[in-house]
Swiss-Prot record:
UniProt KW Membrane keyword: yes
Stretches of the chain found on the membrane's Cytoplasmic side: 1-29, 86-89, 138-151, 201-266, 324-329, 378-391, 449-512
Region (Required for substrate-binding): 400-412
Keywords (A to Z) from UniProt: Acetylation, Antiport, Cell membrane, Folate-binding, Membrane, Phosphoprotein, Transmembrane, Transmembrane helix, Transport
One GO term of the biological process aspect: folate import across plasma membrane
Chain ranges passing through the membrane: 30-50, 63-85, 90-110, 115-137, 152-176, 182-200, 267-292, 301-323, 330-350, 354-377, 392-415, 424-448
UniProt keyword Transmembrane helix present: yes
Protein name per its UniProtKB record: Reduced folate transporter
Matching NCBIfam families: rfc
Gene Ontology cellular-component terms listed: apical plasma membrane; basolateral plasma membrane; brush border membrane
Length: 512
């Protein structure tokens, strides 16, 4: 039994230490959120299309030569940047992202040829691939019990930065009557400031895959053999250790877990939604500003529309967290309904030649997509570990990028069909329409099977009737570190489609 004096002395030692850790954590959170906010302040981003057209680039060059370079280069750099992000422990990739933004705006301001603008797209693809570094970085520095709060803080900072940036850009153009060139110079100033901030970020000591702690890795069978060697011969023990290392390596275990979890219908469904819907979504955002320009070149409320769509996206994604339905039964029908709404909005965009209709339909289109993003995130993560969740999101992002690259090559690139922007939107309308019909048919078949049984389907998971928000709150109490344990509160390593990427949405809209 510990003497009372020693207990009091230990408590007196622990209390200042805990206060110091709490103060340090708060300072770190504030600095990270401030960096996330400042990194989004690029008010000229919503007006890049008018700027390019003022620089005497034609609509055909922007549509069929400049923009297609973005998905091509994004596909090329996505996997290397993803691996470097974890291997270098996040901070160097955040600095690289800021440097790439500097190169983007220098080329935008100083470039004079299509090749310069294509090179600008290459640098911007690096910034798109590096977005995962911020969302991964903030979770590597805090205890798992603070994941939920960190997700909300960082997400709020990013959304606020996107909203303020769009409002500021629109105000400077409409009220201040400044030129788009000056607006891009202001953006470059903000980017340089965010670059300075990135240099003072704290570098984590661990990461998710390559720099895992000893406790997270655990003792492998070969390590146990070394501690308790058997009577076998040295050569046999060495061979067994090598085979055990390969068999029980972290990557092999993750892949085996992925194959096992791929049998879950809900996981397959939402991964398919992520790949196919996000591809169409980003194709729309790539080219929507060109569509606006071709509809009415006298009005330019790009910043206001971006701000409104960001606000609506935040509202719809937040409200989705409180939606409580039986997802095993209704997922396909909800997805089909939302995609049908998206298809009708895309139809209105290219068919009704009114700029205000184009503005409103795009705001609604973006809000509809962001409504399903948090639902998909929690449905995918509901039975996956933190590491496996990151791997699945990475695979989904890669497949979505590959799909939109193929569509771009066929539809947009001058080496393919080279369609004008309005004809492209017809293709995208057919794309969403076919997705909707497929999901409705899929839901109908499930409904027929359900009716034939004449009884309720058993719930696949205990949290089926809960909302994603309730699911994530429950997951906070789960143990962090077991590869097989469900951890839906895992870091939101959303590469391109979650709310962490909202700034990227505005950029590709502006570039389009």
């Amino acid at each position: 039994m510990v003497p009372t004096g020693q207990v009091a002395e230990k408590q007196a030692y622990e209390e200042p230490r805990q206060d110091h850790e709490l103060k340090s954590w708060r300072c770190l959170v504030f600095y990270l959120c401030f960096f996330g906010f400042m990194a989004q302040l690029r008010p000229g981003e919503s007006f890049i299309t008018p700027f390019l057209l003022e620089r005497k680039f034609t609509k055909e060059q922007v549509t069929n030569e400049i923009i297609p370079m973005l998905p091509y280069s994004h596909l090329a750099v996505l996997v290397p940047v993803f691996l470097l992000t974890d291997y270098l422990r996040y901070k160097p990739v955040l600095v690289l992202q800021c440097l790439s933004f500097v190169c983007v705006w220098l080329l935008l301001l100083l470039g004079t040829s299509v090749v310069h603008m294509q090179l600008m797209e290459v640098f911007y693809s690096v910034t798109m691939a590096a977005r995962i570094a911020y969302s991964s970085y903030i979770f590597s520095l805090v205890h798992p019990s603070r994941y939920q709060r960190m997700a909300s803080y960082s997400r709020a900072a990013v959304l606020l930065g996107v909203f303020i940036s769009s409002v500021l850009g629109q105000a400077l153009v409409t009220v201040g009557h400044i030129s788009t060139y000056t607006l891009n110079c202001v953006s470059l100033g903000f980017i340089l400031f965010s670059l300075v901030l990135s240099l003072f970020l704290k570098r984590p000591k661990r990461s998710l895959f390559f720099n895992r702690s000893t406790l997270a890795r655990g003792a492998l069978p070969c390590e146990l053999d070394q501690m308790h060697p058997g009577p076998d011969r040295p050569e046999t023990r060495k061979l067994d250790r090598m085979l055990g290392t390969c068999r029980d390596s972290f990557l092999v275990r993750m892949l085996s877990e992925l194959v096992e979890n791929a049998r879950q219908p809900q996981l397959r469904l939402w991964c398919l939604w992520w790949v196919f819907n996000s591809s169409g979504y980003y194709l729309i955002t790539y080219y929507v500003h060109v569509l606006w320009r071709s509809t009415d070149s006298s009005l330019s409320y790009n910043g206001a529309v971006d701000a409104a769509s960001t606000l609506l996206s935040a509202i719809t994604s937040f409200s989705a967290g409180f939606l409580s339905i039986r997802w095993t039964l209704w997922s396909k029908l909800v997805i089909a309904g939302v995609i049908a709404i998206q298809a009708s909005l895309v139809f209105c965009m290219f068919q009704i030649r009114d700029i205000w209709v184009c503005y409103v339909t795009f705001v609604l289109f973006r809000g509809a997509y962001q409504f399903l993003v948090p639902i998909a995130t929690f449905q995918i993560a509901s039975s996956l570990s933190k590491e496996l969740c990151a791997l699945v999101f990475g695979i989904n992002t890669f497949l979505a990028t590959a799909l939109k690259t193929c569509i771009t090559l066929v539809v947009s690139d001058k080496r393919g069909l080279g369609l004008q922007v309005r004809d492209q939107f017809r293709i995208y309308f057919i794309y969403f329409l076919m997705l909707s019909i497929t999901c409705f048919a899929w839901a109908g078949l499930d409904g027929l099977r359900y009716c034939q049984r004449g009884r309720h389907q058993p719930l696949a998971q205990a949290q089926e009737l809960r909302s994603p928000l309730e699911t994530s709150v429950q997951a906070i109490s789960l143990q962090d570190g077991d590869l097989r344990g469900p951890q839906p509160s895992a870091p939101q390593l959303l590469s391109e489609d979650g709310m962490e990427d909202d700034r990227g949405d505005l950029r590709v809209e502006a570039k389009a």
